[in-house]
């Protein structure tokens, strides 16, 4: 049975822009803006899977680390 969605962990890049890594798949992409990242993620998923085999839903999980003093 085919997967119904693929999840990407998205973080702000230390160099600027954003980085996205798929959970459970060897898919990584990056971009300067969030809109560009969405396009790059779609393209990376299309390139990774055979035609018609890609999950129909892509979920972007935004992760932001914040350090606070105790």
In which residue ranges do the predicted regions lie?
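A short, exposed loop/beta-hairpin motif centered on an aromatic-Gly-Thr core
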Residues: 25-35
């Amino acid at each position: 049975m085919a997967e119904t969605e693929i999840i990407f962990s998205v973080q702000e890049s230390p160099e600027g822009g954003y980085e996205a890594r798929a959970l459970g798949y060897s898919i990584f992409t990056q971009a300067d803006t969030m809109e560009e990242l969405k396009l790059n993620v779609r393209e990376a998923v299309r390139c990774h899977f055979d035609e018609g085999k890609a999950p129909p839903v892509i979920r972007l999980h935004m992760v932001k680390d914040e350090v606070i003093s105790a």
